[in-house]
Design a protein with these regions (language model features):
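Short amphipathic alpha-helical surface micro-motifs
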Residues: 1-3, 36-40, 66-68
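A short linear-motif detector with a strong N-terminal bias
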Residues: 20-21, 33-36, 63-67
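Short beta-strand-alpha-helix junction that forms the catalytic/metal-binding core
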Residues: 41, 65-90
């Protein structure tokens, strides 16, 4: 399935966004981000601590930016930023 902004908005309206997070496409992208970061929490690593990353966070919230749900990066004022970051549960 291709996850379009329209489809994501429909899931949000139906209170079924969990379907996106259970999709094969999201799980593959999530696993890619975790692997690229060696399963380390980026937030903790930036503070000198090593913690196991267990989830991937959207910097640009899916409910606010459904068009970026599957985007690793986003642009703001001409600069590229990471949209998906590996995090622990702490």
């Amino acid at each position: 399935m291709e996850w379009t902004a329209k489809k994501i908005r429909e899931l949000i309206a139906e209170d079924k966004l969990y379907r996106f997070y259970k999709s094969t496409e999201w799980k593959a992208l999530r696993d890619k981000i975790l692997k690229e970061n060696h399963y380390e929490c980026e937030w903790c690593r930036d503070r000198g601590k090593i913690s196991k990353a267990e989830t991937v966070h959207h910097v640009q919230y899916v409910k606010n930016h459904p068009d970026l749900a599957m985007s690793e990066f986003y642009w703001f004022k001409g600069k590229r930023y990471r949209n998906l970051i590996a995090l622990c549960h702490d």
